[in-house]
A protein has these predicted regions:
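Conserved G/P- and acidic residue-centered "switch" motifs that form tight phosphate/ATP-binding loops
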Residues: 157
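Short hydrophobic beta-strand that contains or immediately precedes a catalytic carboxylate
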Residues: 90-95
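Short, surface-exposed ligand- or partner-binding patches at beta-edge/loop junctions that are enriched
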Residues: 153
Length: 225
């Protein structure tokens, strides 16, 4: 056989062997990818099956300000949320009518008191106690539906948390607690001249719009019994 033909045949055999080797490597790669995919699937499924953490608990908040729905905003965040879509969000002030009139209120807010002020002095507790408003839920339902967004405030976030929980039990799903309320938290710095006063945060201290002017068309006043 001529030398040139021997060389050509030898080259062809090397090409065939090389092609077979590449094909074998490609098949091994496919098998490896498939194996990795099958091993990863249970992990992915486990990740998918994991339940998201509960939003109800917010460790940095005092327990009395936490709610079952776990939806929280500051006064400033609540105002921005309302301002962005005033027809889709309702600001709900659950303080007493007396607080609304004498302390001031956000003009866009509806006043539906969670508690009503009494005028019988409790000597043991050292205050005029409040009593629950029996019409609270029915009054809220006159201005909002269970699917509406409600931004709930009181003086400093405690009563509003209670209101959120009651509304949640009544079927409302998007109810946010305004955690610093209208007046804010007490200053606890022993060196501050404002110690013991509500000068820390809250709607008024955040520079948000408020007024003393009554808005009786937005107040659910208690029935005289």
């Amino acid at each position: 056989m001529p030398i040139e033909e021997q060389t050509r045949n030898s080259g062809n055999r090397r090409f065939v062997r090389s092609s077979r080797a590449l094909a074998g490597e490609f098949l091994c790669l496919i098998a490896l990818v498939a194996l990795m995919g099958s091993v990863g699937t249970p992990y992915a499924e486990a990740q998918t099956d994991r339940k998201p953490p509960s939003r109800a608990a917010k460790p940095e908040l005092p327990k009395e300000k936490q709610t079952t729905l776990g939806l929280y905003v500051t006064a400033k965040e609540a105002y921005e949320k309302w301002k962005a879509a005033p027809k889709k969000a309702t600001v709900l002030d659950v303080r007493t009518p007396e607080e609304v009139l004498f302390v001031g209120h956000a003009a866009m807010a509806w006043n539906v008191p969670l508690f009503l002020q009494t005028y019988v002095w409790d000597a043991e507790r050292g205050k005029f106690p409040m009593k629950p408003n029996p019409d609270f839920i029915s009054q809220v339902k006159k201005i909002a539906k269970p699917g509406d967004t409600l931004l709930v405030m009181c003086r400093s976030g405690g009563r509003s948390a209670m209101a959120v929980n009651q509304l949640a039990e009544a079927g409302f799903k998007r109810v946010f607690n305004i955690t610093d309320g209208m007046e804010g938290d007490l200053v606890d710095d022993p060196d501050s001249v404002y110690r013991g006063q509500r000068m820390k945060n809250g709607w008024k201290n955040s520079g948000l719009p408020w007024t003393y002017a009554p808005t009786p068309d937005r107040m659910m006043l208690p029935k005289i019994r």
